[in-house]
A protein has these predicted regions:
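Active-site-proximal loop/turn and secondary-structure-junction residues that shape catalytic pockets
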Residues: 36-38, 63, 88-91, 129-131, ...
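Histidine-acidic metal/acid-base catalytic patches
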Residues: 5-16, 21-31, 39-53, 119-120, ...
Length: 290
């Protein structure tokens, strides 16, 4: 073994660093949910977003099929695209009650089809919230069932040129899926290119480091990111020094992440002041993420 090889073997840190992903050129693509901008009508919201350089819009999934034409007309000629679709389905996928599961199946497929018409990156879904019951038990059999169901949804989404996006939550909101790495593993085991996952800066702060969580999904599965302040889930920046996203942004840069980072948060103060400030904070920290 040569001198360089011996040095590498004697330094686990050096070995880890040498295996770290190399940064790929990418830009911060910010998305707003419909309620983020301090405006009333959709046209006013889109005008405001364009002034700030926001390039994505994340609508709610409820009644989305009825709004496809509205969004298509409103976005015509603009540099804004539909990013992900925020849930909006009825029921839930791990419901023990067959009628609740049937509600999920039909409503989710309606949203997926509409998302495809809009060119969306995917429809966000949570397998089960803590308050939803009766729910299938947290067992390997349930995981196998979930992977089978996700495969079917993923293949359906591919037919509509979109995806389904698993969202891990924190333990206060969900007992089943809390780690981005676990969501990525379900994507893998679902064996469908239409099954993806996402990270949420609010939920990740309760469960693991931003950097490790986002890297664990990798370029193959990471399809969307949510952002909010880290103490109260308000506008980024409202919680002062707590609102540090640099490590997570560094991971996104290293992955060459080319999808959206979308606001999912409330606001305690004047949106006219706090929304532009939040956007500037994100852009500043993106540049700091070296």
């Amino acid at each position: 073994m040569g001198t360089a090889g011996a040095a590498m073997m004697s330094s686990p840190l050096a070995m880890f660093t040498s295996c770290a992903p190399k940064e790929k050129p990418c830009e911060l693509r910010i998305s707003f949910q419909e309620g983020t901008a301090p405006c009333k009508t959709l046209e006013e919201k889109l005008d405001y977003m364009e002034e700030l350089g926001i390039v994505g819009l994340e609508p709610k999934g409820k009644n989305l099929a009825e709004r496809v034409n509205e969004f298509q007309q409103a976005l015509r000629g603009r540099n804004i695209r539909i990013s992900a679709i925020c849930a909006g389905f009825s029921g839930f996928i791990l419901a023990e009650d067959p009628s609740v599961k049937a509600d999920f199946d039909s409503s989710m497929r309606d949203i997926i089809a509409a998302a495809g018409e809009l060119g969306s990156t995917g429809v966000i879904m949570v397998p089960a919230f803590n308050h939803q019951s009766p729910c299938m038990p947290h067992t390997l059999e349930t995981r196998k069932y979930l992977c089978e169901q996700m495969h079917e949804l993923g293949e359906y989404a591919l037919k509509h040129n979109t995806t389904v996006i698993l969202e891990p939550l924190n333990r206060k909101e969900a007992h089943y899926l809390r780690q981005v790495a676990d969501a990525a593993a379900i994507c893998r085991d679902s064996e469908s290119a239409g099954v993806k996952c996402m990270g949420d800066f609010w939920h990740m702060k309760e469960e693991t480091s931003d950097y490790a969580a986002l890297l664990s999904a990798g370029t193959e599965y990471l399809q969307h990111v949510h952002i909010a302040s880290r103490g109260t889930r308000k506008m980024p920046g409202e919680d002062g020094e707590l609102d540090n996203y640099v490590d997570g942004f560094r991971a996104l840069k290293q992955l060459g992440y080319d999808k959206y980072v979308s606001f999912e948060c409330g606001c305690n103060g004047d949106k006219e002041i706090l929304v532009p400030a939040a956007v500037q904070l994100m852009r500043t920290q993106w540049e700091q993420a070296l």
